[in-house]
């Protein structure tokens, strides 16, 4: 089963003679449980593709399905909720909030969604990652 699928994904910036096409009708699908690397030269559209697939930016054309939801048709509010619940992006340079401790930075998406964290699961995850002594 495809966990992620995009069809005819196009992203352009600018207009008229200054228009740049960053992605030109890209289609792909990823199966649940698969691992995929996106590689290419600088300026080849890797970051643009990942931003679109993660719902950080909107395509000029095409559709993006995560599970059975076409995220390219969601309102900004619906997309924000969907991203908090279903999408995780790890950037090359992490973007932690310096006024929050490690625990709160990790739990932030759950707290923003109004959910109560599963403390036992969180503690196990922190221990697995070797972060238990850095949480506060």
Task: Spell out what each predicted region is.
Residues 98-109:
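Short coil-to-helix segment of the ABC ATPase nucleotide-binding domain corresponding to the Q-loop/switch region
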Residues 39-41:
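The feature captures the beta-strand-to-loop junction immediately N-terminal to the Walker
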Residues 54:
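Helix-to-loop junction immediately C-terminal to a conserved catalytic motif
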Residues 14-16, 107-119, 128:
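ABC-type ATPase nucleotide-binding domains, specifically the catalytic core motifs of the NBD
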Residues 69-70, 117-134:
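Conserved ABC ATPase "signature" region
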Residues 17-20, 71-88:
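ABC ATPase NBD coupling module
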Residues 1-6, 12-25:
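A short, flexible loop at the N-terminus of ABC-type nucleotide-binding domains that lies
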Residues 62-70:
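Conserved ABC transporter NBD signature motif
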């Amino acid at each position: 089963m495809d966990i992620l699928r995009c069809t005819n994904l196009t992203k352009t910036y600018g207009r008229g003679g200054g228009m740049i096409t960053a992605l030109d009708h890209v289609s792909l699908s990823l199966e649940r449980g698969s691992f995929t690397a996106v590689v290419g030269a600088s300026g080849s559209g890797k970051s643009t593709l990942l931003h679109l697939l993660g719902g950080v930016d909107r395509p000029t054309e095409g559709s993006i399905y995560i599970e059975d939801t076409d995220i390219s048709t969601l309102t900004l509010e619906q997309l924000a909720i969907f991203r908090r619940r279903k999408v995780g992006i790890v950037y090359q340079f992490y973007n932690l909030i310096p006024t929050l401790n490690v625990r709160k930075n990790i739990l932030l998406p759950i707290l923003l969604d109004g959910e109560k964290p599963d403390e036992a699961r969180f503690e196990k995850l922190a221990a697995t990652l070797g972060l238990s002594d850095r949480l506060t």
